[in-house]
Design a protein with these regions (language model features):
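Basic/aromatic-rich interaction segments and small domains that mediate binding to polyanionic partners
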Residues: 12-57
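Intrinsically disordered, low-complexity, charged/polar segments
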Residues: 42-84
Length: 84
């Protein structure tokens, strides 16, 4: 899982489209069971075109954190979370 302050590039998996898809995002907060808060920017400069959005954790998504690729997913009920 990524941490606060990480810059991520969101990429939809299996055609699922979400707010931050294809933009560079900075993780700014986490809350609840279902959402992670991020800042999405349209350029490498974090002061340009900032917007806030949220990513649903219960959809499988692929992120690229600079050169490292990883997937995460949430499966089953609230007490049965699996992260890869």
């Amino acid at each position: 899982m990524f941490n606060l302050g990480d810059l991520i590039i969101g990429k939809p998996d299996n055609g699922y489209s979400y707010t931050c898809g294809g933009t560079i995002c900075k993780v700014v907060k986490k809350w609840g069971e279902n959402y992670i808060g991020v800042i999405c920017v349209k350029s490498d400069n974090p002061f340009i075109q900032r917007t806030e959005c949220s990513l649903p954790e219960d959809e499988k998504m692929v992120f690229e954190v600079w050169s490292s690729r990883f997937e995460f997913f949430k499966s089953g009920k609230k007490n049965n979370k699996t992260w890869i």
